[in-house]
Amino acid sequence: MELRTAAPEDLGKIMELIDQAKAFLKRNGVDQWQNGYPDQTCIEEDIRKGRGYLCIQDHDVAGYVCIDFEEEPAYDTLDGKWLSIQPYVVVHRLALDASVRGRGLASQVFEETERLARSREIHSFKVDTDNDNQIMKHLLEKNGFQFCGTICFDNSEKIAFEKLI
């Protein structure tokens, strides 16, 4: 699996992946992403800012992820304690094609994100998710992330994790 920076012409495929992910979350009883977020405007901003990436596997688009090296303002309001106070990378909006779910691709996305972060001398990796998203919580724990506390984001409480890399 490799990451490729998303371009405006990828928007249609990305929105397909986002819609698939929304349906997957709903089927699994997860309230996350059921209020219109992320929408096309959000993804267009990811692309414009160079933080939107396609996950390419066997020459096909297998997923989308936002990898952001800018500070997340909501993380300043953590009710808890981060592992570090150093610069960090954040993953948002991870959406995988239904055909590749359960095959370890999300873990590969995390590995590639870590590689990108280390290439920029960044050694902290943060992620947040809804408390009812058991799938993402399991993925984070499996990949060495530690629970650090809760944040308020988009008028809802999220659980926040960090991994030192």
PLM region spans:
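Conserved acyl-donor/pantetheine-binding loop and adjacent beta-alpha core of acyl/acetyltransferases
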Residues: 66-93, 101
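Conserved beta-strand-loop-alpha-helix junction that forms the acyl-donor binding cleft
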Residues: 101, 127-136
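Conserved GNAT acetyl-CoA-binding A-motif
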Residues: 110, 117-129
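Conserved acetyl-CoA-binding loop-helix of GNAT-fold acetyltransferases
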Residues: 96, 102-115, 138-142
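A short beta-loop-alpha structural element at the N-terminal edge
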Residues: 2-16
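Conserved beta-hairpin
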Residues: 51-65
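Conserved catalytic-core motifs of GNAT/GCN5-like acyltransferases
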Residues: 69, 128, 141-160
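Conserved GNAT-fold acetyl-CoA-binding loop/helix
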Residues: 22-42
